[in-house]
């Protein structure tokens, strides 16, 4: 695959990598009738402003708009609005490839259930997906299950809207304020990140909160594996900067990247099948 070293590609295809999905990974998704579509953080902010603040405060941050809206209308209506716009979204081609690859873990700051639906739609996924939203979920047993892949939902999930202990987090900046009942999720991710490469998809590196999140996960730069940053907006200077921080940069969308991975996976399986057949022929002789 272009822009990705053979070593990191093999790490991914051999099941040693962590997939980390942001809002950009859901952008190409939509509901069956086309009424609802995946949103960026800014689009979600504008939606909340239109619904609760008469279109005002769009120049403010998502974190600020979320706090003001929750104070004005309470948490419930905000959660219901998000649920309305995400619950009917369908997995993209990119999502459908995820269950075909073995992962050390999958982490996401998205609230939607696109990954869950992708595994449900696959009749023979490589692993059994186990969702983890809070500290009360059985994290250790999931991590010790060789057939399971943990899905760490760092900012909450629309499946838990009625759980007042786990409110949806509207930005990475808010994570430190709402870590109560989520400490194990982030500590688990950081432990895994120390020994396994992370593939970041769907994050805009121009977003300061996202940069903080990435550096928080990968703070020990010189002692961790190289990571992968997939972002179609990457320019020459961005690639130079992130490369100096032990990232391999791929200027593709999430769907484009996953399609490329799927092609690499198919090539590997074809080579393996040929090798097995040749071995069988040798034994027959």
Pin down the residues of each PLM region.
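A conditional alpha-helix N-cap/helix-loop micro-motif detector
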Residues: 1, 87-88, 178-182, 207
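Gly/serine-rich nucleotide phosphate-binding loop at the start of the catalytic core
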Residues: 1-107, 115, 121, 281-285
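SIR2/sirtuin-family catalytic core signature
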Residues: 1-19, 25-27, 101, 122-124, ...
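Flexible, glycine/proline-enriched loop segments at strand-loop-helix junctions
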Residues: 82-85, 172-180, 198-201
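Electropositive nucleic-acid engagement tracts
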Residues: 114-116, 124-127
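A short secondary-structure junction signal
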Residues: 118-120, 162-168, 210-214
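Active-site gating loop/helix substructures
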Residues: 126-194
